[in-house]
Curated annotation (Swiss-Prot):
Record's keyword annotation contains Transmembrane helix: no
UniProt keywords, alphabetically: Cytoplasm, DNA damage, DNA repair, Metal-binding, Nucleus, Transcription, Transcription regulation, Zinc, Zinc-finger
Organism: Schizosaccharomyces pombe (strain 972 / ATCC 24843)
Subunit organization: One of the nine subunits forming the core-TFIIH basal transcription factor. Also interacts with skp1 and with the mcs2-mcs6 complex.
Record's protein name: RNA polymerase II transcription factor B subunit 3
Primary subcellular site in the record, as a coarse category: cytoplasm
Any one Gene Ontology BP term: DNA repair
Keyword Cytoplasm: yes
Signal peptide from the UniProt entry: none
Location in the cell: Cytoplasm; Nucleus
UniProt xrefs under InterPro entries: Cdk-activating_kinase_MAT1_cen, MAT1/Tfb3, Znf_RING, Znf_RING/FYVE/PHD, Znf_RING_CS
Pfam families recorded: MAT1, zf-C3HC4_5
Span of zinc fingers (RING-type): 13-54
Gene3D superfamilies the record matches: Zinc/RING finger domain, C3HC4 (zinc finger) (3.30.40.10)
Taxon lineage: Eukaryota, Fungi, Dikarya, Ascomycota, Taphrinomycotina
Length: 318
């Protein structure tokens, strides 16, 4: 028996001391008000008549039978943290699109996490609960709208998953039917060959060669059809991509950073030194001879518009 099975057998109800060894169908339940365990029989015995105080010594919480449920996690602290986070996420359910900036959304998430942390570790619980209730009261309409939108998105996602599963199932069934038809065709060809060999007076070798050629023709036709359908789908996807955007990418929005004094053509000048350097393995990544040539040209023409005499006259006048 594994550790989990041994743990379940050894579990006991803290109130009546019943265990799973004598009662394999025993269920241990918890209430999210205090997370104290007790068996289903004790819950029925204590809380059937109405709300009552938790029978665990030192706990003064008033519990209701409708809120008891089975524990999901072995650690009660983790169980409580998950419940707190579910409750807070249902109230603070705003999305990033509802904020003017990313910083405002991050501040909102930080505030929500602080409130969640305080409730999980019981820090300023009364003050934190008051903030949560005040927020829920002030944003009741937006909370309901966001919940409805989330539910609609979940429904759409579930419908898409169902549709995808249905399409996969139909594709599998179609493949099985096609495989069965192909198998039946092959059996018919084999039976026809046997029949011709038994009843016909023709040369058996010619009959076998004819059947082999027919099989090859069928295989070629099937492969051609599959290739055509595959190429058609590829061409369709390519056409759709081209139709979406035919504008070439330009990082400068079409602007060209050229010079009005010269034009550069890499085919009219041969630089033997840089040609040799460009083939070195350490300069492969990002090294271009054109950049070196353009830099030299820009340096040569950079002062061509500089009017020294006009500048001297301005200095004398000042």
């Amino acid at each position: 028996m594994d550790d989990e099975g041994a743990r379940k057998v050894d579990e006991k109800c803290p109130l009546c001391q019943a265990d799973r060894y004598l009662n394999p169908n025993m269920k241990l339940l918890i209430n999210p008000e205090c997370y104290h365990k007790m068996c289903e029989s004790c819950v029925d015995r204590i809380f059937t008549t109405g709300p009552a105080q938790c029978p665990t010594p030192g706990c003064n919480k008033i519990l209701r039978k409708a809120k008891f449920r089975e524990q999901t996690f072995e650690d009660a602290q983790i169980e409580r943290e998950v419940d707190v986070r579910k409750r807070i996420s249902r109230i603070f359910n705003k999305g990033q699109q509802e904020f003017d900036s990313l910083q405002a959304y991050n501040d909102y998430l930080e505030e929500v996490e602080i409130l969640t942390f305080n409730l999980i570790y019981k820090i300023d619980v009364e003050e934190t609960e008051e903030k949560v209730k005040q927020y829920e009261k002030q944003n009741r309409d937006s909370i309901a709208a966001n919940s409805a939108r989330a539910a609609a998105e979940a429904r759409i996602l579930a419908q898409n998953e169902i549709l995808l599963k249905r399409q996969k199932q139909e594709a599998r069934e179609a493949a099985i039917r096609e495989h069965q038809k192909e198998k039946e065709r092959r059996e018919q060809v084999e039976q026809q060959i046997i029949f011709d060999l038994a009843t016909s007076g023709k040369d058996p070798n010619k009959i076998i060669q004819l059947s082999d050629s027919l099989k090859k023709q069928q295989e070629n036709i099937a492969s051609s059809v599959s290739n055509i359908s595959r190429s058609s789908s590829i061409l369709l996807s390519d056409v759709q991509q081209v139709a979406e955007d035919t504008t070439p990418f330009s990082p400068l929005a079409g602007e060209k950073d050229g010079s009005k004094y010269f034009s550069y053509s890499k085919n009219t000048y041969q630089d033997l030194y840089l040609e040799k350097v460009s083939h070195e393995p350490g300069r492969k990544c990002g090294f271009r001879i054109e950049d070196c040539h353009l830099r030299c040209l820009y340096e040569a023409f950079s002062g061509i518009d500089y009017d020294l005499e006009s500048l001297k006259k301005l200095e004398v006048a000042s």
